[in-house]
Amino acid sequence: MSSQIKQVFARQILDSRGNPTIEVEVVLESGAFGRAAVPSGASTGIREALELRDGNKALFLGKSVYKAVENVNTKIAQAVKGLDALDQRLIDKTMIELDGSENKKNLGANAILGVSLATARAAASHLRKPFYRYLMDVKEYLMPVPMMNVINGGSHADNNVDMQEFMIVPAGFDTFSEALRCGTEVFHILKKVLIADGYSVAGVGDEGGYAPDLPSNEAAIEAILKAVKEAGYEPGKHVFIALDPASSEFYKDGKYELKSENKSLTSEEMIDYYAAWVEKYPIVSIEDGLAEEDWAGWKLLTEKLGNKVQLVGDDLFVTNPSILAKGIEKGIANSILIKLNQIGTLTETFEAMAMAGQAGYTCVVSHRSGETSDTIIADLAVATCSGQIKTGSLSRSDRIAKYNQLLRIEEELGENAIYPGIKAFVFNSDEEVEEVVQEIIVEDSEAEKVVVQVEE
């Protein structure tokens, strides 16, 4: 039966924050079916592809996505009907050209991404392959090391903590399932630690982590390490720390304003702030340590800490190959965060990941703070052997859904699932991990082979 697209349909649904988002369904001539829901961020980079919202305050406080839905059901559907779903590059290219803008503002990146992902899912169904294996069919896969956001602050929580995410990284284990068990235990012990220290844990942040009012940002790290020890694990051996300060959110007039500590720091002072933490704590990754427009500061940060920790560009690179290329050329950061909706198509996402791999940058596949029950990023992390994933804490079903999907994939792969542990990080790689990763890193001329595995 034919793999041509027969039907495309979109609807408005709600994300994990109760805000509207778009869900797309694609049906092929063969009857194969694919569905995808698009996430949304709270702290967004200024260069991200445009998420189209209606802006009518009378409807969902201006956040409805009816126009994006209409664009899918009319313009996009007409353009992609009859195209071969197995040709992902053609599908995405068609939508990009139909939109005609640099940031997908006309049709909406949310509309385009929904169709891109739903089409890929339908193609996988047509070939009767698991989605991760459809994206990349290799013998062995790296299971991603999870960065678990157990204390939320910044734009993700209603508290006085400046920095957005304090994460545990259970990298000292042999399997993903063992790492997940460790993370779960530490998360539950952390609640007891915070309560014992007099902090309220009545609510959680957008990504499922606790959101207590703390006397300082460093207090979050201290509480986490205490929980790690009380759970029976050793910091720096079993569990490490990762940070996402999301510093663009507290960068004002050239200074980093840490209100919880009554500090106003220059770029150099902010770098020294992190450097002191790196010496004191088992920190393996810092994401968006400086603001997205502070490229001079990023250069200094990379020179000072780039050989000690993973420095991840999220708002800095926004999963955009052209922006990443500039960062690579200037020696900025050593890792990129991968968020599908920052760039808006599966093809461009793979292009960014291939470019990063060729330059020796790591890739961290990531959720958004406004998530859905869709588990596509779990499959993406495994398919690309990225070795790392950010998908929130150990609560909220929208986060747990991704962890559960990874458990299923690891079980299915058996001995062909490799958990890289600390070796997944740029300053701790080894030959075994590199061997697996090289199977999915290709030259730009072969990027199409990465996007989909087409079987005649």
Swiss-Prot record:
- Binding sites annotated in the UniProt record for (2R)-2-phosphoglycerate: 164, 339, 368-369, 390
Listed pathway(s): Carbohydrate degradation; glycolysis; pyruvate from D-glyceraldehyde 3-phosphate: step 4/5
Query: Which Pfam family is one of this chain's hits?
Result: Enolase_C
Binding positions for Mg(2+)?
Answer: 244, 287, 314
Reaction(s) this enzyme catalyzes, per UniProt: (2R)-2-phosphoglycerate = phosphoenolpyruvate + H2O
Q: What binding details are noted for the cofactor? A: Binds a second Mg(2+) ion via substrate during catalysis.
- NCBIfam families membership: eno
Write down the HAMAP family for this protein, in alphabetical order.
Answer: Enolase
Write the protein's name. Enolase
Can you name the source organism? Francisella tularensis subsp. tularensis (strain SCHU S4 / Schu 4)
Q: Which gene encodes it?
A: eno
